[in-house]
Amino acid sequence: MQPRRLAQPAAADVPAYAIEITPAWTNRMKANAMAKGEVVWRWGEEELVMLPQRALWRPAGRQLLVADLHLGKAELFHAHGIPLPSDGDQASFDRLINLCDRLNPEEVIVLGDLIHGRLGLTPALHQRLRSLPEACGCAISLIGGNHDRGSDLEGLPHQPSQRLGALWLSHEPEPQPSSPLLNICGHVHPVARLRQGSDGLRLPCFAFHASDQQLLIPAFGELTGGHECGQRYRKWLVADNAIVPWLDPLSHSPSRRLAR
């Protein structure tokens, strides 16, 4: 039996060589992903798994991609006399370590903004970051983000945007419309707004822009806010510990193009 396929955009909306929204996975892979609330997605030969923990898994190289942890944000605000809940960092650390325990990655790649700023980089946070590779059981790489600038993170030098297989990894969006690469980035903190009458709900999401060949991944941190993605993006919501493919009826009807 062939696996059920999600609705796909018209062929004219996507690069012909690049995108397959739902891969032909085996029944076992499909069942495992569905049981865990995950979505398996393809870009050419690259298989990617969207995780409800707001992370992206690349099985081929066993890389776990996260972005925008903004560690130390509460402490930075406290330094300016603004109270914020201070347990967000612990929740982010716990979620990351639990993911590593389950997936056993070869590498965790942080797509920028590991910390929120130098003032929030306390001695305790310094120590947590020094011990993070051991806690995760793998190497940690950091593509430097705007909030990481000027910080001295021992063992975590800032790396530039870089290629990984058919992927272009960056912190800020770096569209790849004239290449076969998919830009995976953070920085935006993508969210989707759901409306029902006068009620509204904002949920973190993965967001794909076809003509920019770009996949935005949600902020991994707890105190991060979000930027609402427009109708040109195809979205996968993070809700109730599951990834939920969502089609905006205004932007994904058969008569409307997915992207610019």
Segments predicted by a language model, with ranges:
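Short linear segments in intrinsically disordered or otherwise low-structure-confidence regions
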Residues: 2-7, 11
